[in-house]
Regions:
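AlphaC helix of the eukaryotic protein kinase fold
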Residues: 86-122
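Activation segment signature within eukaryotic-like protein kinase domains
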Residues: 172-173
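Protein kinase catalytic-loop region centered on the HRD/HxD motif
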Residues: 176-188
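Conserved end of the kinase activation segment
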Residues: 241-251
């Protein structure tokens, strides 16, 4: 049976419709990349994969549709493209370099991705944090299925409307700072907080996205610190410990990124790189 949905927005198309009435995309027209899953792919027997929403150093996020519950979802695929050691076969299967898996700790990163996704799925619905619906292995990699949050990113809101005053900013950000504190209580750190990972809903409330970058504080060390097995750094928002393999990561990592995000909200200026700030900073 043909599934007639727009691969950009997942709106249902009636028989005979040639354009999506929601976003205007011609039916059958897709935008994709050679390294991404082919739009129209079915995962875990029930998740329809649409176009890419974004990509990072270790994962790709797609818009998706739960064919059983009939609702939009966001699907995060573990695909550490920044290593240069993964490829796609037949538009689905991920092909790993055996040398990478054995020598560079990529297998450990894969296991950690799964472990943390499962832990986040058990957190329950923390207001202000995107919910995790499902975690599974397929195509030689791992997937996290999350709630799809309608709205625009905080980054787009700021680019469209300009900086906000401090009072407005703190009023908006306080709920997700409180949500982040709850996540930290469960021993999880986000590691990728920035304006493009915060969604502004139609009611003005913020939701923290992309928990696929999160890391368990209990993986290493008796001191509660974790050593980064995969480098994840975002210019202007990541603290210095995320720029090297030996960096000690903790709740302070998210605090730095949140403070940098608030700075950007109030000024519209990208904070200097943490590595640059260490030179002559007092």
């Amino acid at each position: 049976m043909e599934i007639r949905r727009c691969m950009k927005c997942m709106h249902a198309l009636a028989a005979g419709e040639t354009f999506c009435s929601e976003c205007g995309r011609p039916y059958g027209s897709v935008e994709t990349e050679p390294f991404a899953l082919k739009p129209g792919t079915i995962l875990d027997g029930k998740y329809l994969v649409g176009e890419m929403l974004g990509q990072g150093g270790f994962g790709i996020t797609y818009i998706g549709f739960d064919l059983l519950l009939e609702q939009k979802v966001a699907i995060k695929e573990y695909y550490p493209m920044s290593t240069g050691m993964v490829n796609r076969e037949n538009s689905t299967t991920v092909v790993w370099s055996s040398a990478v898996m054995q020598k560079s700790g990529m297998e450990k990163g894969f296991d950690s991705f799964l472990k943390e996704a499962r832990k986040m799925a058990k957190l329950g619905g923390i207001p202000g944090v995107v919910g995790v619906k499902s975690v599974f292995i397929q195509n030689e990699t791992a997937y996290i299925v999350m709630d799809f949050i309608e709205g625009e990113t905080l980054l787009k809101k700021l680019q469209r409307g300009g900086p906000m005053d401090y009072g407005t900013c703190i009023s908006l950000m306080t709920p997700i700072m409180q949500a982040l504190a709850e996540v930290h209580k469960h021993g999880i750190i986000h590691r990728d907080i920035s304006p493009d990972n915060i969604m502004v809903q139609s009611d003005g409330k913020l939701v923290l996205l992309d928990l696929g970058a999160a890391k368990d504080l209990d993986i290493q060390g008796k001191d509660g610190n974790v050593q980064s097995s995969q480098m994840v750094a975002k210019h202007g928002f990541s603290p210095v410990e995320q720029y090297g393999q030996a960096g000690k990561i903790g709740s302070w990592t998210d605090v730095y990124a949140m403070a940098a995000t608030i700075y950007y909200c109030c000024t519209g200026v990208l904070p200097p790189s943490a590595t640059d700030r260490t030179i002559g900073d007092t």
